[in-house]
Amino acid sequence: MNAETVFQTHRPRLMALAYRLLGSRADAEDVVQDAWLRWSGADPASVRDPEAWLVTTTTRLGLDRLRAARRERVHYVGPWLAEPLAVTLQPDPAPGPAQLHALANDVSVAFLTLLEQLGPEERAAFLLKEAFDHDYREIADLIGHSEANCRQLVHRARQRLQAGRPRFNADASQHRQLLARFMDASQRGDSEAIQALLHANAQLVSDGGGVVTAAIRPLLGAERIGRLFWAIARRGAVHPAQLGYVNGEPAILRFQGDRLHSFTTIEVVDGRIANVYSVLNPEKLPKVVTHRNAAASL
């Protein structure tokens, strides 16, 4: 196989790794493109294992980009939420091989937000172990740490993530039903109906990035969240909404004309909504919402 064919064979895995590491489609695409440029300039005779070479290069480029992004986000206005890979109106009814890996791993907005709690090396070590099934020797080579240190990184990451994850997730049917009811209540501005769906200490996290109006701090408490949607409806600022999918996860898609205005996902704990995540920053929203997932996206 020539260099381009080899690279395209491994590209879905590289994109999946870069996206989980960075939580940004644009940044992940840049990292994978940089990996391609380095691969196309490498001497094929000196590369014994192309996949290992590409994964190593992508991991190290991704870590460099993540460190830079963390410094840049100090100046980001309000909460930072992940930029989606795929926003669709319908799920893929028959996932192909390129999606099987993605569907087995969590790329929900909630989980990507949780990953932001980890340091760059912790995040890389955890993902390489848990999402991509590398052993500790391989992880040590990939991120430039000792095996013992990598074990500690993964252990700490597991502890931190476990503390932030719900003990009992809703099944897919319950999750979608709650989301549909939340969409209906929020479109009507029915504060009481919204509060009935939420945990008392629920939070709403909105990402406008300083580009559009959005809360610059998480809104805490079911009553305050209910009042917010009541106020939005009273002002006549409600946008047409329908259920769709973000990274394969059910989501509320709101439109302004033909343009996606925002999307909202939820996290369900013990039968009620614990967290609401809304991305309004137009720089993170696709220009076109497709009907089905692109197989190579996730």
Question: Can you describe what each PLM-predicted range is?
Answer:
Residues M1-D30, D34-W36, S40-D184, D190-S191, ...:
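Active-site-adjacent scaffolding segments
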Residues M1-N2, N293-L298:
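Actinobacteria-biased recognition of intrinsically disordered, low-complexity terminal regions
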Residues N105, Q242-G244, R254:
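Short acidic-hydrophobic surface loop/beta-edge motif
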Residues I194, A202, G271:
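Hydrophobic pocket/interface hotspot
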Residues A200-A241:
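A solvent-exposed, acidic/Ser-Thr-rich amphipathic alpha-helical stretch
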Residues F263-N293:
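Short beta-strand edge/turn micro-motifs at domain boundaries
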